[in-house]
């Protein structure tokens, strides 16, 4: 299962030419995709207008909905934050820690366009969808 992060959805809906948005476009309807409940909230918060909101909500409702948090993930996310901090890595957003940890715990791949996930890949085994080295360059 591939969980798609907010950064990719924003690029996709804005028509931004990014490797991640192109990858999402190729995966829609071809691969099982999931959206986290927190990601759903973030994406829908950014939508202008009622009609666009309903169209976006309808599209996202076709995906598997994943509860990102929960007690076990919350505790493991705190552990992951502490592990990275001990390595000198500053995690800027708690939501990214939760999303990365849900993916690690559940064995999901993450499709993202956010450099903040790279330490989770490098040090904690987060599996991600290959879109080239666009974030690493």
Which stretches of residues belong to each language-model region?
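Acidic, PIN/NYN-like endoribonuclease modules and their adjacent C-terminal/linker elements
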Residues: 1, 100, 104-137
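Short, well-structured N-terminal submotif of metal-dependent ribonuclease cores
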Residues: 1-35, 45-58, 135-137
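Acidic active-site catalytic centers that drive phospho-/nucleotidyl reactions
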Residues: 5, 11, 96, 114-116
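Active-site neighborhoods of divalent-metal-dependent phosphate/nucleic-acid chemistry enzymes
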Residues: 19, 65-113
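A short acidic, often aromatic-flanked loop/helix-cap motif at beta-alpha or helix-coil junctions
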Residues: 41-42, 72-76, 133-137
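Short, hinge-like loop/turn segments at secondary-structure boundaries
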Residues: 50-54, 84-85, 127-131
